Amino acid sequence: MGSLCLQKLSAVERLFALESFELPEVPCSLSFHRHPEYKSITREANEWAFKCTRRDLSPEEKKSLLQWKVPMVTCLSTAHAPKENMVASAKFAWAIAFLDDPIDDNEVAATSYLDTVLSLCNGTASLAEVPDIVAYRACHDLMKDLRSLLQPELFKRTVSTVEGWARSISSDDLKQDYKLYRRNNIFILPLFYTLIGASFEDEDVESPDFVSAQNAMLDHIWMVNDIFSFRNEFYKKKLNNLPAVLLLTDPSVQTFQEAVNATCRMIQDKEEEFIYYRNILAANASRNGKDFLKFLDVLSCAIPANLAFHYASSRYHGMDNPLLAGGTFHGTWILDPKRTIIVSDPNRSNGAASNKLNQIQDLSKLI
């Protein structure tokens, strides 16, 4: 036990001195579907986000927000949803970004902040009763739209998901499993409920196979996020990401590079797990409603859509980074506080992985 502790102490010391690591290719065999009206959907959602700030944004400030590419996951998750649902889902993506940032930056007391968010979602508080910040304004305006757009059952399910996210964020249980914690605080399912705009039978979304498929999708999403957000976390002196957790807790992981490699393998395992359960659900399609199957298809698209977003968003790579032009990258990730720097070695390319990522290479730059 003492030897293991000393090994981990040495690993943590090296982590704090980290200057670079190797980012492997992250292959994805699933396909996303870009909505034909993605340009107007993106424009409307972005203009709404600008209005929520209640500021006369400078061109540079607008450019900074636009490079986040927040509506991207929505626009790549289905080609068939009604435009009003797409716009509402893209607004939801913006609301999530606005809600998430104050917590990440420790700008608010989490418990009172989340209580206010839930009061706005449930309609038990008015905007005039809460502090005037962008997250509350976005939440209030969005919920007003969703109440009129969604069926009552689906709106209730959406609010319930918000409540689950709030509980996970405000929990003071320091002994809970990190992977379960991250699965619970990935606040993305409401985007997909809004896209479909239809409710499902509880027995469909509570079946063991569907829960397993959904959990695999959520795990893939947060694991990708943990890899691509590492630079931001590192310079905030936070260890709230899977590679750091593996380095600290897994006896078989002795270096940060081993932790990154293990995380990327887990991402691939989660894709395969999702496909396995999705195929089981599709084989039983005759007993499920068409809306449920549309929802399952959206979850399938969400995996590559989220991956494309993480390659292309300035939230992870810094403003005006050439990497934001679209496509994937891999190689030596040189840590820098302002931007992602990748030094690629073309001789180390994995052809099979590259072929799987062709769709992201071709389309992510168009959003």
Where are these regions (language model features)?
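Alpha-helical, largely C-terminal catalytic domains
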Residues: 1-367
